[in-house]
């Protein structure tokens, strides 16, 4: 009897993933059509993402599930309050507020088919300070494109013969998280652009790139002074595969200059999928379609955690925004400048330390600050800084929890390993916020 009952459950688990993947692909196409001005409403893409999310719910467990449920409850309560008090119900924003962001994340995931760092299995692993610096730069650049996959690929190689050391873990953690400052393919950038309407990708990246460079330099200097650095086992990096994301970034900027009205997230998602298909066709035409389809069936469902997290964040932002607007409540601030942005940055990083995901802090801040109409670039830069520093210091960040599960690293150690680094980066970030404010006047 129990076996008969378990069969439908098992069958659902086997089929829900591929179906969810196809729904995500449909949502990417619908989102691109909306962003390119083809007359389709954003709610179609949002609905497809929500259907995929419902199918993929069983894959989301632990802290991510708790955070998702909490955001849905708070956001839902805000929507209900606004409806009861003011008769306002922003269902469309809750349904489709993050559809462009999700389409970008899903579209960029196709780049893993053509941009993975390759290495000969028999190639010797480099050692010493030079290997540390090269691995740091490698995880930063590849992570800026293929996201957390870069950390897993490099970490698998480094831990194949011996347990990962705290030095190796720090290199991967800092190098990866710094990409949040500038990368157009990083989740942080999508969240920043979605929650700071009017922000300019070029401006955000222009401010973020020097900060990332300073962070990499600081990390290389700090970690090269640690004991045992001469025995550091690095990754034999080859940077040839980076020409593809470089070409994609150039295409995005070029098309954006030619068509500035087209949303940047829509450009990234549509061009990422298109460029991946073209590269696969040029490499081996007979395998292009099978590889793309395999990614749809198996790769896209793996983003179930991000999918549900950002869907719930859309509900949270809509709920808080609706409640604030319905109640007529405003912050006691005349303007939102660099000083206020600095305080917000410190608050969000502090919340990250105790396990509050940056997307929750950003969605909440967006709902509260929207009535003040802050400089979108200033607030966008602040969000990117909060993401970069919060991810590197929090024991409960998705990256550190993934490293715990994969490599047996105690995530609480990152508070100690990255603590002084994070404080120094916050000083640099606050200085950059004030410099940007002075420059933009």
Report residues per predicted region.
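C-terminal transmembrane helix pair
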Residues: 27-32, 168, 174-188, 204-219, ...
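Core transmembrane alpha-helical segments of multi-pass membrane transporters/permeases
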Residues: 68-69, 73-80, 86-115, 136-137, ...
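Membrane-interfacial loop-to-helix junctions in multi-pass transporters
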Residues: 100, 124-135, 163-168, 302-306, ...
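Membrane-embedded helical hairpins/re-entrant loop segments and their flanking transmembrane helices
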Residues: 111-141, 148-169, 368, 373-376
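Membrane-interfacial helix-loop connectors
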Residues: 153-164, 189-202, 337-393, 405-407
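Flexible interhelical linker loops that connect adjacent transmembrane helices
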Residues: 222-246, 287-300
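Transmembrane helical segments that form the transport core of multi-pass membrane transport proteins
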Residues: 251-361
């Amino acid at each position: 009897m129990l076996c008969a009952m378990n069969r439908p459950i098992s069958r659902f688990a086997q089929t829900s993933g591929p179906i969810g993947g196809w729904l995500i692909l449909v949502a990417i196409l619908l989102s691109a059509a909306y962003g390119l001005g083809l007359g389709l409403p954003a709610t179609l893409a949002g609905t497809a993402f929500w259907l995929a999310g419902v199918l993929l719910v069983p894959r989301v467990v632990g802290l991510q599930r708790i955070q998702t449920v909490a955001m849905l409850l708070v956001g839902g309560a805000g929507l209900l309050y606004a409806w009861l008090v003011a008769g306002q119900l922003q269902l469309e924003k809750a349904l489709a507020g993050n559809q462009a962001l999700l389409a970008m994340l899903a579209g960029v995931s196709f780049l893993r088919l053509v941009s993975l760092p390759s290495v000969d299995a028999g190639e010797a692993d480099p050692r010493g300070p030079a290997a540390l610096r090269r691995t740091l730069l490698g995880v930063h650049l590849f992570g800026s494109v293929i996201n957390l996959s870069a950390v897993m690929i490099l970490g698998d190689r480094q831990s194949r013969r011996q347990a990962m050391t705290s030095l190796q873990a720090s290199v991967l953690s800092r190098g990866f998280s710094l990409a949040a400052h500038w990368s157009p393919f990083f989740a942080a950038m999508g969240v920043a652009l979605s929650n700071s309407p009017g922000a300019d990708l070029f401006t955000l990246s222009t401010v973020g790139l020097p900060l990332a460079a300073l962070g990499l330099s600081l990390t290389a200097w700090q970690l090269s002074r640690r004991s045992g650095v001469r025995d550091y086992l690095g990754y034999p990096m080859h940077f040839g595969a980076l020409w593809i994301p470089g070409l994609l970034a150039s295409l995005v900027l070029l098309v954006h200059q030619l068509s500035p009205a087209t949303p940047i997230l829509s450009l990234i998602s549509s061009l990422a999928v298109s460029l991946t298909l073209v590269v696969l066709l040029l490499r081996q035409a007979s395998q292009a379609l099978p590889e793309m389809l395999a990614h749809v069936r198996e790769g896209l469902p793996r983003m179930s955690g991000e999918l549900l997290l950002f869907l719930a964040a859309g509900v949270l932002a809509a709920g808080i925004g609706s409640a604030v607007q319905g109640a007529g409540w405003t912050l006691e601030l005349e303007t939102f400048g660099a000083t206020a942005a600095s305080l917000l940055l410190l608050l969000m990083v502090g919340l990250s330390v105790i396990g509050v995901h940056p997307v929750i802090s950003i969605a909440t801040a967006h709902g509260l600050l929207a009535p003040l109409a802050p400089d979108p670039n200033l607030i966008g830069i602040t969000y990117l800084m909060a993401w970069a520093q919060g991810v590197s210091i929090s024991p409960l960040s998705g990256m550190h929890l993934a490293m715990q599960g994969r490599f047996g690293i105690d995530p609480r150690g990152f508070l100690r390993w990255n603590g002084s680094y994070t404080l120094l980066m916050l000083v640099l970030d606050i200085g950059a916020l004030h410099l940007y404010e002075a420059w933009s006047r």
